[in-house]
Amino acid sequence: IYKSFMQLGADVVTLGNHAFDNEEIFDFIDHSKKLVRPANFPEATTPGTGLIYLNINQTKLAVINLQGTALMQNLDDPFMVAEELVEQARQHTPNIFMDFHAETTSEKQAMAYFLDGRVSAVVGTHTHVQTNDARVLPGGTAFLTDVGMTGPADSIIGMKKEDVLRRYVTKLPTRFNVQENGPGILSACIIE
C-alpha cells in the first residue's frame, strides 16, 4: 500500500496501531524516507522513525506521528514524547504537522491544546470516521479530531457490513473482513 501511495504522489504516509501487523513492513520501513510510525513505540526495539522532514514547494515541514494510550496499547507517554520531538523539530522548521493516532476524542483534543502555538497542525486519526470540528485553536494551531479513513464507502469502518452486524446482533466473536468492492471514499483535510 505504501508503495502505491508513493507512486500516486503522496508526500508522506503515517502509521498507527496496525503498523506492524503485516510482516512485509519489516523489509522496507528502515529504508522508507516518507513512512512515519508512531514515535512512542519502544525506540530501542522498533524499526522506522516517528519524525521526518520533508521539503514541499521549497518549504521544510516536520511530520510527527504519535499514538494515544487511552483505550489503546500501553506505549511511552505521547505527551512527553511530543514535547521532545516538537522541540527537536523546531530547531529545523516552524512548520510541524502532528498525526495523533488515538481512540478517544478527549485525548486528541488534549494533545492539540498541549501543542497549541508550538505546531502548525494536530490531526487525529484511527476511528475511521471524519469529525466535523475543524478549527484553529487560540495559539494558531489547526486542529481536526479525526480526518477519517480512505477506503470503501459502503462499509462499516472499512469492513464488510455483514460481519460487523453479525457481531453486534449475535454478540458472538466474528472475524471482520475488509470490504474490497464498490465505491471508495477519500477523507482528507486541507490546512493553509
Regions found by a protein language model. Give the residues of each.
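Acidic, metal/ion-coordinating pockets
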Residues: 1-192
